Amino acid sequence: DRGLFWQKFSDFNEDGTVKTDVGVLIKVKQISCYGNDSYGGMSGRDIMALACGLYESCDFGYMHDRVQQCEYLAQGFYKAGVKGVVLPAGGHAVYINMDEFFDGKRDHTTFAGTGFSLELIRRYGIRVSELGDFSMEYDLKTPEQQAELANVVRFAIDRSRLTQEHLDYVIAAVKALYEDRESIPNMRIVWGHKLPMRHFHAFLEPYANEEK
């Protein structure tokens, strides 16, 4: 909405182009304080469910099961021959190092980890989080900062929702994708390259690995 508020509080260059979009600034603040504009609010019922979940998560039996599920998934990836599995697994998620997954053949600026997450949900309906080169803004960092970044994808395990059959499906899907990893596309940013927290609202498009 580029109405009076936007016109009054945005900054413009002399030629009339937008220098600072106040709408983007407000959205970034909203994401960091509350959540994305697509998340919706929480009803009283949801808040009570959250309180119950926090109480249950303090139970030792629950925590043990969480750790065991993460270990099962990580070991499943490892035994399937998938490279880059971060071991030992933690208590809420399993991580795969994308540099090792792609045998070091993908440049950091190709954002191949995002391509991996795209193909995993497109082919198998599995949603993961890329927490590497794209999310951590590798291309905008200094060489010293780049050396400290981990190029990983996170498989967070939903609490009290996934059975062993679910995890076996994820293992089989990642194994199949690993064996076909040469076909996984790279990604380029088409809008929002320098936006704060760009992984929430930038736009990307895939391109073939052979294309430069």
Identify the residue ranges that each predicted region occupies:
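PLP-dependent enzyme catalytic core of the Aspartate aminotransferase-like
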Residues: 57-58, 123, 135-212
